[in-house]
Amino acid sequence: MATEGRGKETNEIKTHFTTREGLYRLLPHSEYSRPNRVPFNSQGSNPVRVSFVNLNDQTGNGNRLCFSVGRELYVYIYKGVRKAADLSKPIDKRIYKGTQPTCHDFNHLTATAESVSLLVGFSAGQVQLIDPIKKETSKLFNEERLIDKSRVTCVKWVPGSDSLFLVAHSSGNMYSYNVEHTYGTTAPHYQLLKQGESFAVHNCKSKSTRDLKWTVGEGALNEFAFSPDGKFLACVSQDGFLRVFNFDSAELHGTMKSYFGGLLCLCWSPDGKYIVTGGEDDLVTVWSFLDCRVIARGRGHKSWVSVVAFDPYTTSVEESDPMEFSDSDKNFQDLLHFGRDRANSTQSRLSKQNSTDSRPVSVTYRFGSVGQDTQLCLWDLTEDILFPHQPLSRARAHANVMNATGLPAGSNGSAVTTPGNSVPPPLPRSNSLPHSAVSNAASKGSVMDGAITSGVSKFALLSLHDRKERHHEKDRKRNHSMGHISSKSSDKLNLVNKAKTDPAKTLGTSLCPRMEDVPLLEPLICKKIAHERLTVLVFLEDCIVTACQEGFICTWARPGKVSKFQP
């Protein structure tokens, strides 16, 4: 498969590719762009960004698409693979002067057919809250740039909240906001709450707000993402480090260093057990949340990796007998149904497996990456990589596919985290099998066995109903969590060991294993799909969405979906 993907050097733009599920096809009529369809001159502009939200309306057209190109921002009804895009009827269109949108995020919790909250970050540091359906601009945060003057790199709603959101800047700082708070016209004053190696958390002294300021690493904070259960926050920075925090307590859970250069992007696996990163080393790196270590790297791109994303619809638990696939809607719909219902089916499949036969269970995670080399790569993370040194057994597979509701035992950061103020010992060198340097996963068996008791995997995704019931309580706890974070006196905080890890000394340690010390993944496919660098990769139920810097948002129909397309 890898040879098919890499193939000969060519400038030909691919319009289809094949995986084990079947044929993926580009749908030209489902392409979204600026209404004039003229390629955007990307010189000096921020990356094109895309956000989705589903309004759960009764018309069947519940998906909404927001994308930013240069100084322009558009919101459309996203018709996906079924109908052609109508660029003449945007829900909302905005053109900004003096600044450019850099990122945006819908609030999925509060979205309805009548109203949706959209956060937009800008190159000058401001953040705007708008409702593209009601056409109302609700609020502008950091309006006078008193909080931070640098470019907004990432903005996201706090999971389960209708009012809290987090904003990262190229300064390396990250700020929490509350849409219900009033922000003054003077610069805020912060006091130190917690400090660790290469990070510090401050509290705003204002009586009207209790917002936090995080300073993480050195250089720009390029992206952050919440774990599927909302308890942990992962950040990647220009200094090349991945850092994972307990969000409420601001405790550092674990870190990882890139092979070279800055880390630009990351994504959690649907069950919260793994994080994939990409960056300036042209690699994708898979990091285990439970073990706090790199478990694999992937080499397929020829330039910086700009986006990584897991595909929850092909991430699966399967019996040893392979599933039959064909280019038909029925078979692929069965696969999607299985993907959506993994939470319920995982236990039933494993129980049935244990009671009927001895066929092993296989765990496969699918993720994708796009880069500045204009290539799309798809990767499979399989059980031989996840659990080296051990024969595949039903008990082992059972232990590792359960307990994704809360993150694994030991996730408080104390049980498995390498102390942040010291460089881990070097890994053993090996010129034979790449697994030789990987620690024996059997030592984690007791942790994994305890994880089983927490219940059936839900891939850490709360239902909309559950989130609405819980978000008020979460907001109350997070608004008062500073007492927990600041439990130590300021004197003790000032005595925290400020020693910094020397990046040059991390190579060959568990923070940054050598290339020969961890398994090297080859892409399933690696296809050139655009003329300009790729900046977007989103996996939806019936398609894959990509976008390039020319401003074209492309829809790739999954196998079996093209036949029902309506112009």
Swiss-Prot record:
Q: Spell out the Basic residues composition-biased ranges.
A: 468-481
SUPFAM superfamilies documented for this protein: WD40 repeat-like
Q: Domain of life here? A: Eukaryota
Record carries keyword 4Fe-4S? no
Q: Listed GO molecular functions?
A: deubiquitinase activator activity
Ranges of the WD repeats in the UniProt entry? 147-187, 216-257, 258-297, 345-389, 529-566
Give the disulfide map.
none
What are the Phosphoserine sites (modified residues) in this protein?
A: 355, 358, 430, 432, 463
InterPro entries membership? WD40/YVTN_repeat-like_dom_sf, WD40_repeat_dom_sf, WD40_rpt, WD_repeat_creC_regulators
Polar residues bias: start-end ranges = 411-421, 429-441
Cellular compartment(s): Cytoplasm; Nucleus
Q: Where is the major localization of this protein?
A: cytoplasm
Q: Name one GO cellular component term.
A: cytoplasm
Per the record, which residues fall in region Disordered?
Answer: 408-441, 468-493
Q: Mind telling me which Pfam families this protein's record contains?
A: WD40
Q: What does this protein do?
A: Regulator of deubiquitinating complexes. Activates deubiquitinating activity of complexes containing USP12. Anchors at the base of the ubiquitin-contacting loop of USP12 and remotely modulates the catalytic center of the enzyme. Regulates shuttling of complexes containing USP12 between the plasma membrane, cytoplasm and nucleus.
How the protein assembles, per its UniProt entry?
Interacts with USP12; promotes translocation of USP12/WDR20 to the plasma membrane. Component of the USP12/WDR20/WDR48 deubiquitinating complex. Interacts with USP46; contributes to the cytoplasmic localization of the USP46/WDR20 complex. Component of the USP12/DMWD/WDR48 deubiquitinating complex.
Annotated protein name in UniProt: WD repeat-containing protein 20
Organism (species) = Mus musculus (Mouse)
